[in-house]
Amino acid sequence: MAELKNDRYLRALLKQPVDMTPVWMMRQAGRYLPEYKATRAQAGDFMSLCKNHELACEVTLQPLRRYELDAAILFSDILTVPDAMGLGLYFEAGEGPRFERPTDTIDAIKKLSIPDPEDELGYVMKAVSTIRRELNGQVPLIGFSGSPWTLATYMVEGGSSKTFEKIKKMAYAEPAALHMLLDKLADSVTLYLNAQVANGAQSLMIFDSWGGALSHTAYREFSLRYMQKIVDGLTRFADGRQVPVTLFTKGGGLWLEAMAETGCDALGLDWTVDIADARRRVGHKVALQGNMDPSMLYAPIPRIEEEVGQILAGYGEGTGHVFNLGHGIHQHVDPEHAGAFIKAVHAQSKQYHK
């Protein structure tokens, strides 16, 4: 593997000194870029794009050609794991992901097998190894998965949900069934992420997109407990250096201390959290990633630059901050505004790293 030319992102996650704050964007390979839309049209549909390792590599690299980003993130989807479990993933126009065979009964859960990441998910591993090779040491490659709770919401609900009625009914009326599902998912995700590291991922992120839908105690029981199980089982050293792990619960500002206790290296923050407060609470234990409101990218460029300055000042001096949005970039954002955001982070952050 080529030697890493820019390791700023990995160093910040491990709270090692950096010359400026590293930056990348969730969904940086996505629909706001015209070149992404062209490649997706070439693939035919979203899952065909994910399953073609050459095209998945192409869209992963597209934002790096435009912007001076400090990391690449594998182009894939969190629902690859349940899809590999045989649920029949498909996408309804305007409705998002759906499953032909939801796992909403204990019998369905018992029948689920844990997918072999090199077999049923081999197309993801081929994409990881292709991207790592093509990056040629330019920046680190982030691998990722959804959290067990978040994957389970789609599997039990049969797709996206605003109320989470079915999975919450299972959580409170049939907790043993849900725990069986979450346990299988934790094992599946651990294998999946370790296979990504074996194929070239240099950092890992667990996206708990729907953890914030849970009550204070239910979050620990149904989400955090299973992310902890994954963190305990991950490969944390490869290619002669540490493989940092970031946990991100959207709506998880209440639970930063508990998340920091898992042994992860960093926490992702959504835009509702005050980064200065987060650093006071958990900055002695973990690095922090975030956390500009993605909608701020619709603002005039001077306002974006002002917001970047406020977040950098909120975090303050020293390492341990990876700048990002508080969630994925919106599809209608002007690519020039995204570029101005990235430049502003680099230009304004040097003063905090003297």
UniProtKB/Swiss-Prot annotation:
Enzyme class: lyase
Catalytic activity: uroporphyrinogen III + 4 H(+) = coproporphyrinogen III + 4 CO2
Residues annotated as transmembrane: none
Binding-site residues for substrate, renumbered to this chain: 27-31, 46, 77, 154, 209, 327
Keyword Transport appears in the UniProt entry: no
Cellular location(s): Cytoplasm
Principal location: cytoplasm
Sequence similarity: Belongs to the uroporphyrinogen decarboxylase family.
Positions bearing the site annotation: Transition state stabilizer: 77
Subunit annotation: Homodimer.
Record-listed E.C. numbers: 4.1.1.37
This protein's UniProt keywords: Cytoplasm, Decarboxylase, Lyase, Porphyrin biosynthesis
Organism this protein belongs to: Shewanella oneidensis (strain ATCC 700550 / JCM 31522 / CIP 106686 / LMG 19005 / NCIMB 14063 / MR-1)
Protein name, entry field: Uroporphyrinogen decarboxylase
